[in-house]
Amino acid sequence: SLKGDANLRYGPTTDANIIYRYQHKGYPMEILRETDGWRYVKDPQDGVEGWMRSFLFSGKRYAITKSEPFSYGYDNTKKNQILVKLDPGVHTSIKNCDSKWCRLKMTLEDEELDFWVEKKNLFGVYSNEIIN
C-alpha cells in the first residue's frame, strides 16, 4: 500500500510523464514486477498500470470495498452478526485473512471497529491469499 502521495508514471524514471497522482495514504496497489528501485503496478480498482518508486510503498496492508451496492462487516466470532454497512470505496486496514474472509480495522466517528468482510468484496487482497 502507498505511504502517501505518489505519482504513477509511464516509465521507470522521474522524467517519464505522469499518468495519475494518487493522494491516498494506504491505497493498495498490485505489484506486477520490480526493477532498480521502481515497481510496475496495477490499480486494483480501475486497472490502470504504470511505474512507481519503490520507496513510496509501506509494508502495511489495506483494502478498499468494491463497487457493490455495499459490503457488510460481520462480528469477529460468529461472522453472522452485521456490525457495519460499508459503502463502495471505503479504505480499511487489513489485520489478517483466512481462505474466505478478511479481518479489517477502521475508525468511524472516534470508534475503533474490528470486523470481517468476505474477500470477494475487497480490492487489495487475492482470493487465495492468507495473511497472518
Model segments located where?
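Boundary regions of SH3-family modules and the immediately adjacent low-complexity/disordered segments
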Residues: 13-14, 21, 28-34, 42-81, ...
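Short N-terminal segments immediately surrounding and downstream of signal-peptide cleavage
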Residues: 1-9
